[in-house]
Amino acid sequence: MLYPSIDNLLLKIDSKYSLVTVAAKRARYMQLENDKGVLPSYQSDKFVGKALEEIHAGKLVLQNDDK
């Protein structure tokens, strides 16, 4: 079973497309900047998994810039 589950993640960000975009951007940032992350520990070793864990923990949110 995958952690965190897609159902739990969609409670934080309502669109699966937005979820993928946010996770990919965060994972890329973590990789390029050698960022260790904002959580004390992670279950995943991969950057995308860490980004999804941050979303699940509420540390990473989507900001809408509707103008």
UniProtKB/Swiss-Prot annotation:
The keyword Transferase applies. One of its GO terms (cellular component) is cytosolic DNA-directed RNA polymerase complex. Its EC number is 2.7.7.6. GO terms for biological process: DNA-templated transcription initiation. SMART domains: RNA_pol_Rpb6 (SM01409). It catalyses: RNA(n) + a ribonucleoside 5'-triphosphate = RNA(n+1) + diphosphate. Keywords: DNA-directed RNA polymerase, Nucleotidyltransferase, Transcription, Transferase. GO terms for molecular function: bacterial-type RNA polymerase core enzyme binding; DNA binding; DNA-directed RNA polymerase activity. Pfam families: RNA_pol_Rpb6. Promotes RNA polymerase assembly. Latches the N- and C-terminal regions of the beta' subunit thereby facilitating its interaction with the beta and alpha subunits. The RNAP catalytic core consists of 2 alpha, 1 beta, 1 beta' and 1 omega subunit. When a sigma factor is associated with the core the holoenzyme is formed, which can initiate transcription. Belongs to the RNA polymerase subunit omega family. HAMAP family: RNApol_bact_RpoZ. This is DNA-directed RNA polymerase subunit omega. It comes from Listeria monocytogenes serovar 1/2a (strain ATCC BAA-679 / EGD-e).
